[in-house]
Amino acid sequence: VKVYVGGRSLAGAQVTVDGRPLDPRYDLKRLSPAGFEWTYEGNGPAQLALALLADHLGDDARALALYERFMREVVADLDNSWELNAAEIDAAIRKIGG
């Protein structure tokens, strides 16, 4: 089961999946020049939502269709330090109608 972890350090916002840096997936859509963010709605949180969904779902088209709702419902409400597992992401996707 994949585990996604986000936190802040002097180097900025860092997000990992199973201990490895999460790919921002700029190849799908470049929403944020500054990388990932969370705790609010905006470009950085949208990039994180897209990256989380693309990695979790393995379906780029579905990730592109869902990332804005996922950003508003999940990413904007994350704490400064957070952890999400696959079951939590699946539950959030069901909640937003994905």
What positions do the PLM features span?
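Amphipathic alpha-helical packing elements
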Residues: 6, 11-66
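Short, compact, well-ordered microdomains
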Residues: 58-96
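Long, low-hydrophobicity ectodomains and other hydrophilic envelope-associated domains
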Residues: 1-2
